[in-house]
Amino acid sequence: MFPGGGKFNPRMMKQMQKMMKDFGMDAEDLKAVKVTIELEDTILVFEKPKVQVMDMLGNKTYSITGKAKKVAKAEEKIEDVEVKVEVTEEDIEMVSSQCGVSKEEAKKALEEANGDLAEAILKLGN
């Protein structure tokens, strides 16, 4: 890639950077700690990568160099679980007497409030 038999010459690097600037290209090293790339079925994680961003006429290109670890993607699907709260007769009587409603109305309000006495009483009070 480099002229001169592949030997790296710091002066040549300076000339290349100047040429890049002349063509509207600018390169900058980023101090990245970790880079994560999320694919459809896996995740690539680069620990201690070398990241360089090149700006070419307003378009930025990121270059990541380092060793990638493949990580299995966790299944994101969470099933809805319906929780049924058991309402006690004591709670029903308390809500019924506090709000002056029938036991059926009190039970319904408690079920809608997932057993929360205060919420059921507030609901029936309005």
From Swiss-Prot:
UniProt cross-references to SMART domains, sorted A to Z: NAC (SM01407)
GO MF term set: RNA binding
Biological processes per GO annotation: protein transport
Pfam families in alphabetical order: NAC (PF01849), UBA_HYPK (PF19026)
Family matches, as InterPro entries: NAC-like_UBA (IPR044034), NAC_A/B_dom_sf (IPR038187), NAC_arc (IPR005231), Nas_poly-pep-assoc_cplx_dom (IPR002715), UBA-like_sf (IPR009060)
The UniProt record lists the keyword rRNA-binding: no
Annotated NAC-A/B domain residues: 10-77
Annotated Gene3D superfamilies: DNA helicase RuvA subunit, C-terminal domain (1.10.8.10), Nascent polypeptide-associated complex domain (2.20.70.30)
Highest rank taxon of the organism: Archaea
UniProt keyword Lipoprotein present: no
Record key words, sorted: Protein transport, RNA-binding, Transport
Free-text function comment from the UniProt entry: Contacts the emerging nascent chain on the ribosome.
Family statement drawn from the similarity comment of this UniProt entry: Belongs to the NAC-alpha family.
Assembly and binders: Homodimer. Interacts with the ribosome. Binds ribosomal RNA.
The protein, known as: Nascent polypeptide-associated complex protein
Species, as recorded: Methanococcus maripaludis (strain C5 / ATCC BAA-1333)
